[in-house]
Structures are given as C-alpha cells and as structure tokens.
C-alpha cells in the first residue's frame, strides 16, 4: 500500500537548510540552532491543551488511574524516558507512569521491522497492561498517523480511558480519535523527514510538562522542591538533606536527624522540622492530607 507523506509538515523540505551540505560546520550548526529556537514557541502555542492533559492526569492519579504513553521509534523511546524518570524524582510507583514502544523492549535500542505498522499490536499491548477507564493514554507520533498508536488509541477509547495525542502535524488521523490534542507545529526538519530533531525536541518538552505538572498537582513538589525524591544513590542522599534544609531553614545535623527518624522520607522530615511532630505523627498527618505538605501544615 502506497503511503502519501507529501502533505505532512514533518516531511516537507526546509528552505533554510536546502544547502546545508555545503556550509561550514559552524554555519551548519547555526542553521540547526536557529530552527531549534522555533520549538519552544510551538509548544507555547498549545499550553492550554497541555494544561488540560495535565489536569486529566492529576485526576487519574488521585482516582487510582495511570498515565500510559504509547509510540513507535523516537516517540516511543521519549515516552519510556519520561516514565522511567518519575520514580527516582518523585518517589512514584513504577506502574504509575508507563511507556510502551512498538516492538517491545528490544525496540528501545534497535528498530524492529514493521512493528509501527501493526495496529492490532498497539491494542494488545494496552490490553496486556490492563488499561481501564481510570487511565490516561497519550499517543505519541510526530506524523500523527502511526498505525501502532492509532490501534492503541482506538482500544483506549473502547474501554473509556481518556485519550490525548502528541503529534506535530495538524488535522492528522490521531486528532480525530483524541479527547485532547497537543499539536506543536514545529515546521519542516533541517534534514527532511528526520522527526527525531525538532519534533522530538517538542515532544520531550511537552512530556516534561505533563509529568512535572501532574506531580505538582498531586503534592509531590513543595515550593519548587522535589520532596518525594528517593535516596537511591549518594547524590540523592545529599539532595534529600539539602531539600529539608531549603524547605525548613534547619541545619544539616537537624536535617540528617529528621531523615534518620522517618526512614529517609523527605516530605515527612520537612513536616517534622516545621511542625515539631514526631515521625509517626507527621506521617499520619501527611496521609490525612494526601501528601500535601502545605495542607498538613495549615492543620495545626
């Protein structure tokens, strides 16, 4: 079956880079850099739609639902990257944000032939994951037409999940299936069709916003501090101490003592120092207020 890609913005030729192969290295990189500067503006143009998805994800998290990313190639890898960073950054369950890629784990490192063209695989991967009406699915594809993602979106709609798209081509087949469309139109790529470049950068910026925004909305950030960070290495042990110090103004000794008394739960240590509660009482108070430090502090 012949596929017509000529109408896709991401497949168009970029006039600014038509002679990039004869430029000096600095000139070549200047063209790339100038094109990259358009990406943040394209994302800015869709902030209201991104906000709608963030709010939907926050509701899902608070209702026992999950955020599921699905994509092929670069798009799938970006979803997996974003999902994998949530547990160490926010202390979230690894099952809370999940990234799926056409072709499975082996496709993370190496392309799997024809996997992205398998519409049924997109659906069955979600079925295996037990997708349900509490979940939010974000279908990621620069083209907006990847069969694997379309199959996943159709299945998600059939079970009542909230469905959003992240693509870089307006009026794509994916937009017809979604409840919320996020379409940062970044224009033609420097290398024609290489959507890992501007489109991929736009996708990464949006994914950062989705999980960061949802985690803030569910109490995992106090001020601008990642108060649910887990101390899984030496750097993060020190970061926990620094966060407690920044949040409370206490000494390093006081921060260390508080953390040691609450099994290194950063959020609990902060509440202990600020409220004078012991570890057990601070944990209970946080649980009472769904992990929101500000709400726990106001209930004194």
UniProtKB/Swiss-Prot annotation:
Keywords: Carbohydrate metabolism, Lyase. Pfam families: GKRP_SIS_N (PF22645). It is an enzyme of class 4 (lyase). Residues 57-220 form the SIS domain. Its EC number is 4.2.1.126. The active site is at residues 85, 116. GO terms for biological process: 1,6-anhydro-N-acetyl-beta-muramic acid catabolic process; amino sugar catabolic process; N-acetylmuramic acid catabolic process; peptidoglycan turnover. It catalyses: N-acetyl-D-muramate 6-phosphate + H2O = N-acetyl-D-glucosamine 6-phosphate + (R)-lactate. Pathway: Amino-sugar metabolism; 1,6-anhydro-N-acetylmuramate degradation; Amino-sugar metabolism; N-acetylmuramate degradation; Cell wall biogenesis; peptidoglycan recycling. One of its GO terms (molecular function) is carbon-oxygen lyase activity. Homodimer. Belongs to the GCKR-like family. MurNAc-6-P etherase subfamily. Specifically catalyzes the cleavage of the D-lactyl ether substituent of MurNAc 6-phosphate, producing GlcNAc 6-phosphate and D-lactate. Together with AnmK, is also required for the utilization of anhydro-N-acetylmuramic acid (anhMurNAc) either imported from the medium or derived from its own cell wall murein, and thus plays a role in cell wall recycling. NCBIfam families: N-acetylmuramic acid 6-phosphate etherase, PRK05441.1, PRK12570.1. A lyase-type mechanism (elimination/hydration) is suggested for the cleavage of the lactyl ether bond of MurNAc 6-phosphate, with the formation of an alpha,beta-unsaturated aldehyde intermediate with (E)-stereochemistry, followed by the syn addition of water to give product. This is N-acetylmuramic acid 6-phosphate etherase. The lineage of its organism: Bacteria, Pseudomonadati, Pseudomonadota, Gammaproteobacteria, Vibrionales. The gene is murQ.
